[in-house]
């Protein structure tokens, strides 16, 4: 036993959580995955127009680079119906929208393979309340 006591100073480090900026596209990807799991997506023009005319649509995602201008006019017209106005988001790439909507195969590493493009996707059921969903709804309330 020694007469000298060792004093150990413990410094507490405060960890500041850095919230990564979540873009609208990232939030949309999470919302579409959640709706896909809960069987709440209508994928493609035929299913989407049926959901829009029945009034089941909660959100419409449209590809802005569709070759047929009539498709854009039809979907925008149904989404902007005065009786049942539905929020509309436009994305650039059909293959990316198809991947988000589950129109492809997933390999062992988790990468998407054989992805089919989608011109329009309609969310009929949110599935679960997430932070990304509230972010998208807040985005539409600001517009």
From Swiss-Prot:
Gene3D superfamilies from the UniProt entry: 3.30.1330.30
Disulfide links within the chain: none
Principal localisation: cytoplasm
Q: Which InterPro entries match?
A: Ribosomal_eL30-like_sf (IPR029064), Ribosomal_eL8/eL30/eS12/Gad45 (IPR004038), Ribosomal_eS12 (IPR000530), Ribosomal_eS12_CS (IPR047860)
The chain's coiled-coil residues are: none
Compartment list: Cytoplasm
Description of how the protein assembles with itself and partners: Component of the small ribosomal subunit (SSU). Mature yeast ribosomes consist of a small (40S) and a large (60S) subunit. The 40S small subunit contains 1 molecule of ribosomal RNA (18S rRNA) and 33 different proteins (encoded by 57 genes). The large 60S subunit contains 3 rRNA molecules (25S, 5.8S and 5S rRNA) and 46 different proteins (encoded by 81 genes).
Indicate the family of this protein. Answer: Belongs to the eukaryotic ribosomal protein eS12 family.
* Protein name according to UniProt: Small ribosomal subunit protein eS12
Q: Which organism is it from?
A: Saccharomyces cerevisiae (strain ATCC 204508 / S288c) (Baker's yeast)
